[in-house]
UniProtKB/Swiss-Prot annotation:
Coiled coil: 563-631
Major place of residence: cytoplasm
Gene that this polypeptide is encoded by: uup
Name of the featured protein: ATP-binding protein Uup
Domain notes: The C-terminal domain (CTD) helps bind DNA, is required to complement a gene deletion.
PANTHER family listed in its UniProt record: ABC TRANSPORTER ATP-BINDING SUBUNIT, ABC TRANSPORTER DOMAIN-CONTAINING PROTEIN
One GO CC term, this protein: cytoplasm
Region (C-terminal domain (CTD), binds DNA, required to complement a deletion mutant): 551-635
InterPro entries (alphabetical): AAA+_ATPase, ABC_tran_C, ABC_tran_Xtn, ABC_transporter-like_ATP-bd, ABC_transporter-like_CS, ABCF_ATPase, P-loop_NTPase, Uup
Compartments it resides in: Cytoplasm
Segments forming domain ABC transporter: 1-253, 320-546
HAMAP family: Uup
Effect of deleting the gene: Increase in the frequency of precise transposon excision. No visible growth phenotype at 37 or 18 degrees Celsius. A double bipA-uup deletion does not grow at 18 degrees Celsius, i.e. the uup deletion exacerbates the bipA deletion. Deletion leads to an increase in DNA crossing over, DNA repeat deletion and DNA repeat expansion; double uup-radD deletion increases the phenotypes. Although single uup deleted cells replicate normally, they are filamentous and lack defined nucleoids, again exacerbated by a radD deletion. A double deletion with priB is disadvantageous to cells.
PROSITE patterns registered for this protein in UniProt: ABC_TRANSPORTER_1, ABC_TRANSPORTER_2
Length: 635
């Protein structure tokens, strides 16, 4: 029997139902990704599965005593109390006892007075009476598993830690089904990697909504597509779903075209002259009326946005030039000795954990902050368009149209006037939706409105700070195409690995302590170069340490068991090892430079060949030293 079965589900808040006679079956130990366009009803379906929202019609059957928990789309904000208090509330009615026990236990540790000890004894009796010790242990296990400090104030946590706390709150109820709505939103790449690993160890079923294509590929065992009120299951991985979905839409288009052709024929027949009307078949007339109804009820596939950037005249060739830039805040080094040159047309991603200094570096480059030391040169003729969903101001009480055009009927697009409603339709806002207050928009619609407003501004430098949150896959792909065709310079902050892969030519990775590594290519290219550089340095460091120890040992010990010639060779080997290691390290530094792989192929191959030869020479010298040492010691 399925854990959850939904039959004939119907739900509507407007003319077009969110669920139209939908069917869904959820099995044990699977990871189901729910996909669909913005506004299709995915989050509403999650609420239905979590018993927060009812159906207009249809039924849902749950396995007996099934526990379902939901991680909401937005992390908790402005919540008072400790992490323990927040997580414990996932157990609902027993939470108050457990929170009181946690608070009084901390109090006793600092003040073991008789009054506090008596209070602790009372609370312990309540836990005994309600048999809550097992729940207390479960909360502590979940907190330890997530690396959460139970005593920290929830309000002090960053977005990633808030997301972990919310996940802990969902997990303490020990659910068989875990519902995750956009779990990667606002998380940095390191935390997303951690989340993937953690969720793969979850003993139960996961149903999740995500527009992070890398996350979907790594997690999903089945795809469920919500499209125009219908739920369609696609077994297998995400790439297989994309192929099958494309084919299904192609077949639907052909079927609709054939239906429309037949309908047009019947309309011609019904409009024929008196002779035709005398002889016409009443059954055929009824069939025509049914066809008209079917055509009128058809829900068309949601269109694709038509984004277009308003490009300004070209900037100077050098957009930014930085030399030994340093910047720190409250003793924390965010940027240290960073040097780089950004040329016109470069597309660069800034990658690193939340709070590492990505936005700070952008502000330094734009002159909004002053560097502690170093030099930043800003190029000429720059026209900047800056997208930052966290700082962008939208009036929630004004309509979509008024937020964009401030009461005007036209906007200027590429130097030509265009009606506001027509421009908004390019961003998938139908005229009726354009009259809606912003507070009623979904996260994806809000971001589309911000992009629509941004792209009205002429620019030759596009700065995008987390532009992908809440956008559906189709809009993401269009934004990728837009960035690819943009003639100006792009600086991008994003935690969407595939989006970075598809849009940039260089990555700046924040590696800790203010160090920023520059690497050619997209995210996975950059990570590969970074790992290669680390792997190359480790053997060299080990050889240096061993050679230094060997040098000291050679001076210290006698050499009575070696001939004069071999003894001289042994004494000279430590210095040779140091020289070879220095040579290898110099070559490795060349390879690690961000511009290395952009050089002509012949040059890079020569350096790589020299590096391989130096590694072999170092290995042979080290083996010779080991042999002579063993010989000297009678080995």
């Amino acid at each position: 029997m399925s854990l959850i079965s939904m039959h004939g589900a119907w739900l509507s808040f407007s003319d077009a139902p969110l669920l139209d006679n939908a069917e869904l079956h959820i099995e044990d130990n699977e990871r189901v990704c729910l996909v669909g366009r913005n506004g299709a009803g995915k989050s509403t379906l999650m609420k239905i599965l979590n018993r927060e929202q009812g159906l207009d019609d249809g039924r849902i059957i749950y396995e007996q005593d099934l526990i379902v928990a939901r991680l909401q789309q937005d992390p908790p904000r402005n919540v008072e109390g400790s992490v323990y208090d927040f997580v414990a509330e996932g157990i609902e009615e027993q939470a108050e006892y457990l929170k009181r026990y946690h608070d009084i236990s901390r109090l006793v540790m600092n003040d073991p007075s008789e009054k506090n000890l008596n209070e602790l004894a009372k609370v312990q009796e309540q836990l005994d009476h309600h048999n809550l010790w097992q729940l207390e242990n479960r909360i502590n296990e979940v907190l330890a598993q997530l690396g959460l400090d139970p005593n920290v104030a929830l309000s002090s946590l960053s977005g990633g830690w808030l997301r972990k706390a919310a996940l802990g709150r969902a997990l303490v109820s020990n659910p068989r089904v875990l519902l995750l709505d956009e779990p990667t939103n606002h998380l940095d790449i390191e935390t997303i990697d951690w989340l993937e690993g953690f969720l793969k160890t979850f003993n139960g079923t996961i149903i999740f909504i995500s527009h992070d294509r890398s996350f979907i590929r790594n997690m999903a065992t089945r795809i469920v597509d919500l499209d125009r009120g219908k739920l369609v299951t696609y077994p297998g991985n995400y790439d297989q779903y994309l192929l099958e979905k494309e084919e299904a839409l192609r077949v639907e288009e052909l079927q609709n075209a054939e239906f429309d052709r037949k309908l047009a024929q019947e309309e011609v027949w019904i409009r024929q002259g008196i002779k035709a009307r005398r002889t016409r078949n009443e059954g055929r007339v009824r069939a025509l009326k049914a066809m008209r109804r079917e055509r009128g009820e058809r829900r068309e596939v949601m269109g694709t946005a038509k984004m277009q950037v308003e490009e300004a005249s070209r900037s100077g060739k050098i957009v930014f030039e930085m030399e030994d830039v340093c910047y720190q805040v409250n003793g924390k080094q965010l940027v240290k000795d960073f040097s780089a040159q950004v040329l016109r047309g470069d597309k660069i991603a800034l990658i690193g954990p939340n709070g590492c200094g990505k936005t700070t570096l952008l502000k330094l480059m734009l002159g909004q902050l002053q560097a502690d030391s170093g030099r930043i040169h800003v190029g000429t003729k720059l026209e900047v368009a800056y997208f930052d969903q966290h700082r962008a101001e939208l009036d929630p009480d004004k309509t979509v149209m008024d937020n964009l055009a401030e009461g005007k009927q036209e906007v200027m697009v590429n130097g030509k006037p265009r009606h506001v409603l027509g421009y908004l339709q390019d961003f998938l806002f139908h005229p009726k939706r354009a009259m809606t207050p912003v507070r009623a928009l979904s996260g994806g619609e809000r971001n589309r409105l911000l992009l629509a407003r941004l792209f009205l501004k002429p620019s030759n430098l596009l700065i995008l700070d987390e532009p992908t949150n809440d956008l559906d896959v189709e809009t993401l792909e269009l934004l990728e195409e837009l960035i690819d065709s943009y003639q100006g310079t792009v600086l991008l902050v994003s935690h969407d690995r595939q989006f970075v892969d598809n849009t940039v030519t260089e990555c700046w990775i924040f590696e800790g302590g203010g160090k920023i590594g520059r690497y050619v290519g997209g995210y996975h290219d950059a990570r590969g170069q970074q790992e290669q550089y680390v792997a190359l340095k480790q053997p060299a460091v080990k050889k240096t340490e061993e050679a230094a120890a060997a040098k000291a040992e050679t001076v210290k010990r006698s050499s009575s068991k070696l001939s004069y010639k071999l003894q001289r060779e042994l004494e000279q080997l430590p210095q040779l090892l140091e020289d070879l290691e220095a040579k290898l390290e110099a070559l490795q530094t060349q390879v690690a430079d961000a511009s290395f792989f952009s050089q002509p192929h012949e040059q890079t191959q020569k350096v790589l060949a020299d590096m391989a030869a130096a590694e072999q020479e170092l290995e042979q010298a080290f083996e010779r030293w080991e042999y002579l040492e063993a010989l000297k010691n009678g080995g």
